[in-house]
């Protein structure tokens, strides 16, 4: 499994998702995760990365 380092996080409550940009250590490939749901009541989030 690849190890990712988090470099930037963008939180968008209006659209209820968290956009995360990072890179894979092994191959230094640019990746972007946008499938993160936000719980409006608790302001917490859960990732649904594949």
Q: What is the meaning of each model-derived region?
A:
Residues 37:
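Residues in the recognition helix of alpha-helical DNA-binding motifs
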Residues 23-24:
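Short alpha-helical "recognition helix" segments of helix-turn-helix
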Residues 40-41:
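DNA major-groove recognition helices of helix-turn-helix
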Residues 1-18:
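Short, amphipathic alpha-helical "recognition" segments used to contact nucleic acids or chromatin
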Residues 44-50:
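Short Lys/Arg-enriched helix C-cap and helix-to-coil transition segments
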